[in-house]
């Protein structure tokens, strides 16, 4: 089963995921938005995407606040090669199937 975690053992589901790819097709990014978290936002150091192939990680995380109140986390996962892009897509296929998410 594919999961996303900020804290070990606490699965999270993003509110939105956007995919971007360069014109050359070599580089890409996935931008995750999380508006409701189970994890304590004070202890988040990175995001882990875990499935049967292993683990993908990123530490590119930005918290969004409005009038001092937490609104969302924005996480960016960058892919530098076609192999990284393909690996990420395999993870997202598993994750979306496990969490009843669709593509728009």
Curated annotation (Swiss-Prot):
Protein name: Photosystem II reaction center Psb28 protein
Annotated GO CC locations: photosystem II oxygen evolving complex; plasma membrane-derived thylakoid membrane
Pfam family, any one: Psb28
Entry's family note: Belongs to the Psb28 family.
InterPro entries assigned to the protein according to its UniProt record, in alphabetical order: Psb28_c1_sf, PSII_Psb28_class-1
Predominant subcellular localization, coarse grouping: membrane
Membrane topology per record: Peripheral membrane protein
This protein's UniProt keywords: Membrane, Photosynthesis, Photosystem II, Thylakoid
Signal peptide: none
One BP term from GO: photosynthesis
NCBIfam families: PS_II_psb28
Gene3D superfamilies named among the record's database cross-references: Photosystem II Psb28
Subcellular location: Cellular thylakoid membrane
Summary of subunit composition and partner proteins: Part of the photosystem II complex.
């Amino acid at each position: 089963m594919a999961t996303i975690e900020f804290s070990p053992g606490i699965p999270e589901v993003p509110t939105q995921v956007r995919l971007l790819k360069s014109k050359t097709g070599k580089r890409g990014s996935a931008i995750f938005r999380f508006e409701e978290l189970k994890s304590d936002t004070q202890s988040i150091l990175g995001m882990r995407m875990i499935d049967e192939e292993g683990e993908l990680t990123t530490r590119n995380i930005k918290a969004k606040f409005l009038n001092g109140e937490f609104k969302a986390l924005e996480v960016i996962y960058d892919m530098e090669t076609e192999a990284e892009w393909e690996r990420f897509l395999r993870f997202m296929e598993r994750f979306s199937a496990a969490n009843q998410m669709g593509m728009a």
